Regions:
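Flexible, glycine-rich phosphate/dinucleotide-binding loops
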Residues: 21, 95, 159
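Phosphate-handling substructures
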Residues: 24-25, 29, 34-39, 80-136
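Short, well-ordered beta-to-alpha junction loops that form the rim of enzyme active sites
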Residues: 65-69, 91, 153-157
């Protein structure tokens, strides 16, 4: 499905995952997708407990979550609190930087923002573009077209492709309407 095949409007309640705790994985020098195994911190779990009290979430029909641990742990608490069904989508993962290391990630983020989500031909770091991210999200969400309101628990860079917010805090809720 391309971006030219859109048609169904869906209310999406984006939720950024709770604060993660990377300490154990960093101590063991995990990188790449290995770092995505990080669970929520205690503060992150408290953030989700507060989030779960939001009656707005119950207006949705389903929760769709990234398969990344910090998002999935967030989604599991929200699903328990709301009673909403939970689906896990591996394609709702974090923005991809195709090189390892926190320095390379930060450089890629800077270049992504400076270049409005585009990857310049001479870029010193390779990363997923805004168009690629948006396409990945829309293709993934197409299977939920029968739902009018969906909670999507995902990651800041992915959410930013659909909302104007510069800063998206842990467990922040942002509602928008998206054509799927």
């Amino acid at each position: 499905m391309g971006l030219d095949q859109l048609g169904t409007k869906m209310k999406v309640i984006f939720v950024r995952h709770g604060e993660p705790d990377y300490r154990e994985l960093e101590e063991r020098s995990y990188t790449g997708f290995g770092i995505d195994l990080a669970p929520l911190s205690e503060k992150g779990r408290q953030q989700v407990q507060e989030l779960s009290k939001d009656p707005f979430l119950s207006s949705a029909e389903i929760i769709v979550s990234s398969a990344v641990t910090r998002a999935l742990e967030t989604a599991s608490y929200v699903a328990c609190a709301t009673g909403l069904p939970l689906r896990v989508e591996p394609l709702l993962h974090e923005w991809q930087v195709y090189e390892s290391g926190i320095d390379r990630f930060e450089e890629a983020r800077r270049l992504f923002l400076e270049n409005n989500g585009e990857l310049l031909p001479n870029s010193p770091v390779q990363y997923e573009t805004a168009v690629e991210m948006k396409t990945r999200f829309l293709e993934c969400m197409a299977k939920y077209r029968e739902h009018q309101t969906v909670v999507v628990i995902a990651h800041r860079m992915l959410i930013r492709q659909f909302v104007a917010n510069e800063k998206i805090d842990f467990c922040q809720v942002i509602e928008c309407e998206i054509e799927i």
